[in-house]
Amino acid sequence: MNIRKIAELAGVSVATVSRVFNHPERVLPETRERVLAVTREHNFTPNWFARGLTLGATKTIALLIPAIDSYFSQNIISGVETVAGNKGYVVLFCQTHGDQEVEFDFLKLMKTRKVDGIIQVQSQLSETDFHEPLSLNMPRVHIGKNQDCGCHMVCYLDYEEAAFRLVKHLLTLGHRYISLLYDDKRDGELADEMESGLKRAGREAQCEAHLSIFRAEDSAQGGYRAFQRMVQKGTIPDVLVTAGDLQAIGILKAARDGHISIPEDMALACFNDSPVCSVVSPAITSVEMPAAKLGMAAARLLFDSIEDDTRDPDILQEMILQPKLKIRESCGNKTGIFELFV
């Protein structure tokens, strides 16, 4: 069964059948229904990939992301899929593990697969990797603040504002010495934003705050082992802030095993809030980063570019999403209500 046979059985032209599949709004309802009835009767499905090769579009986009197992990553994926699905596109997922070579190999593969566009999350590549050896001639959006990746469509979360709100809260509780436990596979973006937010909060509060930075695997096990090392060295900080919720959960377990009380002996907070943060004891003060909205924003930027090829690809388009601080119990908050949102 092919499109010509469908046209013959429906008593219409091949062009009409093509319009039913591609631009149904341009076909009279009774004609459209007649064609669709024939396709249903014969279980006919258009070969979208072959059609894409003919028209120069495959209705497929690629999402290159360092990891897919975290709550944050899953929300980005969900946001991208929501927008892509509404557009009738499928999404190819490529897990790069934060490895430049893996990411580059995936990009080469996506070029041969002729995807219509690419979303890269926290890319570790530089602009020369695209224009010289790869020459990717397709719309690309970057999620993250990497200024060297060559993307002119960028979406990212305002980590400086997130750090400012968190540190401001910590300073009101009397904390002055803050340690950041960072993902050992990421660049220094969060650490830089954390330091900038800390300094701004200190200036506003007219007090001096100090930041020290540690690295660990972005997992519960990574947080657990990192805190064990701190205990063994006798370097338990006043406040420990983690880059993600999983590290914080691991630290909470390590503190309990080591008979260290949170928040009495050490305050604990994290970026990238998840549902787990509100149900553990003590509930963890965290910064909610709207990852699903971030994925949706990136996908919308990408599809705007795919659908409007008259846009100047060299004009920077930037979308910045704002955080929300969720004040709970792990930093010493004594407010009687369950949660405060700032």
Model-inferred region functions:
Residues 1, 22, 26, 30, ...:
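Residues at secondary-structure transition points
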Residues 14-19, 53-69, 169, 177-184:
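Short beta-strand segments enriched in small/hydrophobic residues
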Residues 41-47, 101, 121-123, 252:
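Short gly/ser/thr-rich secondary-structure transition/capping motifs
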Residues 56-168, 172, 231-232:
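Alpha-helical recognition/docking segments in bacterial nutrient-uptake
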